[in-house]
Amino acid sequence: MGEKVYIFDTTLRDGEQAPGFSMTTEEKLQMAHQLAKLNVDIIEAGFAAASKGDFEAVNRIAKEVKGPVICSLARALESDIEIAAKALEPAERKRIHTFIATSPIHMEYKLRMTPDQVLERIKKAVSFARNFTDDVEFSCEDATRSEREFLYRAIETAIKHGATVINIPDTVGYAIPEEFGQLIEDIMNNVPNIDKVILSVHCHDDLGLATANSLTAVKHGARQVECTINGIGERAGNAALEEVVMALKVRKDFFGDLYTDVNTKEIYKTSRLLCRITGNFVQPNKAIVGDNAFAHESGIHQHGVLSHRMTYEIMNPEDVGFPMSRIVLGKHSGRHALKRRLEELGFKFTKEELDRIFEKFKELADRKKEVYDEDLEALIYQEFMKIEDHEPVKVLHFQVQSGDNMIPTATVKLEFKGEEREASSTGNGPVDATIKAIQKALGIEPKLLDYSIKALTPNTDAQAEARVVLELDGVKASGRGVDTDIIKASVKAFTDALNRAIVRKEYIIQRQEIREEGTV
């Protein structure tokens, strides 16, 4: 057996800090269960001290998700560490991840602390965290812009006082692979007792080099990689888990006997679940999980793949769970056929949940002849991944008049926090008129940042999936809606995004106060 590279997934912490990617507690829980199926080693469930919402999410995940180590981020402050420890109490296996900046620019302008004061803070934070768990990770924020000798001292201090994992973040995505690899090698050669801990890396993608830097670090001695599904994260994002894991698996000729315990057959499903939850879909040419990742249009390429797959493909689509067959269900399909297909897609439900899904499936099958996998995924999302049981805005009814040489007009009746309201409006089209009527009824006008709609499946009776990104008082949120009627799909997407913005507004403002002080 070779050497293991630990996969530390921070989708639910660093990943969801990106604008438009915030998740509710229930959504985080859905993702955490799937990450456990993916078999990542560590799930960073959130930043428990950031807000009540973050605390609840970390606590629920610690209580309900089994398998991976559950981790919470905490600044190098006793108050943060105590809150993280409290949130993690139910976890079978837990880790506290504490951090402080070590670069001159951060120490002088953000922390307003001397290097000696920072070292003292590291000592106290790591020692205090060890009172709650034997698994403590310490991160040197902005490590790649830190003075080398001071970085060594900071790491040595953390190890001396009980850190079990040392993380080297390229916080601003500044590093180039060759120099980042050299940094890891220098740390391995110059820090006493570095062999007693796991050396970790956390790379941002500002220069498009996060995956390359992470892999170079592994080659030079790092044995934990912090990454996110689809590479999501602040600014340009993080190293993509799927890219790091598959590079190590496919290029064993280069990386030797290094391996991960990730169940790669769950990669595609995990990627799709994140897309559904956040409403942000990966670009078609995204490595490993994009729609075109295993598509071939060139005649020469098609001929080669048909002759022998490995002529133009370096991995099997099945290795990442990429669906190669499309099973079509219809109105004559029974409960057993539906249950079997859902299980093949990786979904498992109780009898009561399956009854709900089957009822919705039959309604959908009556409206369209053929029900594809994409339809089933959308149906499950609509039924089981709503943002809240109580939504602030509920559209009760709407009617639209539109046609050739007519001004599109919409009338909407809705409920806002229990109060019924009604309004009418005209617009540049039926969707525009309906959205304006909703805004008029609510008395608010969020800024629409993006709107798109696409057919999920072939044929004119296909379900449409609408996606909306909006901003309400500085809070960005995305929503999606699915229906065979494109106006209904658009209304669902708009109200979904609006509800998310309303629910998250205070939550995000609270967390912003913490985030301004820095994260890795």
From Swiss-Prot:
- Give the coiled coil ranges: none
Q: What class of enzyme is it?
A: transferase
User: Catalysed reaction(s)?
Assistant: 3-methyl-2-oxobutanoate + acetyl-CoA + H2O = (2S)-2-isopropylmalate + CoA + H(+)
Gene3D superfamilies the UniProt entry points to: 1.10.238.260, 3.30.160.270, Aldolase class I (3.20.20.70)
* GO BP annotation list: L-leucine biosynthetic process
According to its UniProt record, where is this protein located? Cytoplasm
What residues bind Mn(2+), as annotated?
Answer: 14, 202, 204, 238
Q: Where is this region: Regulatory domain?
A: 394-520
List UniProt keywords, sorted A-Z. Answer: Amino-acid biosynthesis, Branched-chain amino acid biosynthesis, Cytoplasm, Leucine biosynthesis, Manganese, Metal-binding, Transferase
Recorded GO CC terms: cytoplasm
Instruction: Give the metabolic or biological pathway.
Output: Amino-acid biosynthesis; L-leucine biosynthesis; L-leucine from 3-methyl-2-oxobutanoate: step 1/4
| Record EC number | 2.3.3.13
Q: Where is the Pyruvate carboxyltransferase domain?
A: 5-268
**Family classification:** Belongs to the alpha-IPM synthase/homocitrate synthase family. LeuA type 1 subfamily.
Matches recorded under NCBIfam families: leuA_bact, PRK00915.1-2, PRK00915.1-3, PRK00915.1-4
SUBUNIT field: Homodimer.
Function, as annotated, reads: Catalyzes the condensation of the acetyl group of acetyl-CoA with 3-methyl-2-oxobutanoate (2-ketoisovalerate) to form 3-carboxy-3-hydroxy-4-methylpentanoate (2-isopropylmalate).
The name this protein goes by in its record? 2-isopropylmalate synthase
The uppermost taxa in this organism's lineage are: Bacteria, Pseudomonadati, Aquificota, Aquificia, Aquificales
